[in-house]
Regions:
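Gly/Ser-rich catalytic serine loop of serine hydrolases
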Residues: 86-98
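Stable alpha-helical structural segments in soluble proteins, enriched in small hydrophobic residues
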Residues: 98-110
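C-terminal nucleotide
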Residues: 2-12, 16-18, 25-27, 33-78, ...
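Glycine-rich beta-strand-to-loop/alpha-helix junction loops that act as flexible
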Residues: 94-96, 274-279
Length: 307
């Protein structure tokens, strides 16, 4: 039986980790996927199977990398193998990451497993393998999404070459504060959004804002979340939400600009990008989730973590 691989949420670090900020990524068990061979092929399984065939050809180009048994992979593909997944594509919750993790898990001959002592070297090795594998899906990948899905534990990124598995404060089921996902109702695409960011990074003003403000507040958010300092977390999330609103407009779907600003002005909720933006989910932080739910009653809200 194939293992299940979960979605992920990058709580903090979108765009920042490209420029060496801290980041914090957590598994999200609400969505999941597994490799399967269908009894009778469907439209869905055929589409997935054809993507996996292309993916297999990509893996042949980098085959020295992960010691993958591509002959077995191809045999299964000819039997109709597909990735049966509930993870929405283009939503910033790691649909391609889970697929990459599943393929590595099933076909790597000498895989690094969750059960062994995960040294920093092993984590970086996995991340490198995953980054090359996932580049098939969106050009440039940090390897973090598959890593998160594969290990299914929170990951703290301290810098590009310093990643650790981490514990996060346990949830308070009766807490009034919460992290939630807001459904934008449209899909986003990673590659064009990252290109816009890279283009903007060529301007001195934007670069300066990233290093002096964006990264600073991202790092403070990670620190205050992990230490359980909720007051500081909301203060920094508010600053981050404002910086994103002022400098990352193309990544925020047009019809959410007003809503984004309303949250900052009222203090009821603070929105931020979930992954690369441009659609998919928008991440929200609310000091009082009931009030936020009321203010956002026309939207689909999914609470993912209670403070």
């Amino acid at each position: 039986k194939s293992s299940l691989f979960f979605a992920k949420i990058l709580l903090f670090g979108e765009y920042g980790i490209i420029e060496d900020s801290k980041g914090l990524s957590i598994p999200y068990n609400f969505f999941k996927g597994a490799l399967k061979i269908p009894e009778t092929p469907s439209e869905k399984s055929k589409n997935s199977n054809s993507i996996l065939f292309d993916f297999c050809n990509h893996l042949k180009q980098i085959k020295g990398l992960a010691d993958l048994d591509l002959i077995l992979f191809e045999k299964h593909l000819n039997e109709g193998l597909y990735f049966d997944s509930s993870i929405p594509k283009g939503y910033g919750v790691g649909s391609s990451g889970a697929l990459v993790a599943a393929v590595y898990d099933k076909y790597s001959n000498n895989k690094i497993t969750v059960l062994e002592n995960l040294t920093r070297e092993k984590l970086l090795k996995l991340k490198t393998i995953f980054s090359k594998m996932e580049s098939f899906f969106h050009g440039k990948s940090s390897g973090l999404d598959p890593l998160n899905s594969y290990l299914s534990i929170p990951i703290l990124i301290k810098s590009k070459n310093d990643i650790n598995v981490t514990g996060i404060p346990s949830q308070k089921s009766n807490g009034s504060g919460a992290v939630f996902l807001l459904d934008s109702g449209q899909t986003g695409s990673t590659a064009p959004m990252v290109s816009i960011f890279m283009e903007k990074m060529k301007s001195d003003g934007f670069r300066k804002m990233i290093s002096s403000q964006f990264i600073k507040h991202t790092n403070s958010c990670v620190d205050s979340f992990l230490s359980g300092d909720i007051k500081s977390l909301f203060a920094n999330t508010k600053k981050l939400s404002k910086i994103v609103f002022e400098n990352f407009k193309p990544m925020i779907p047009d019809e959410f600009h007003q809503l984004w600003k309303k949250g900052i002005d009222s203090g009821s909720y603070f929105l931020k990008l979930c992954g690369s933006g441009g659609g998919g989910y928008i991440l929200g932080f609310a000091p009082d989730i009931e009030k936020a739910k009321n203010d956002l009653k026309d939207y689909n809200l999914e609470v993912v973590y209670h403070f």
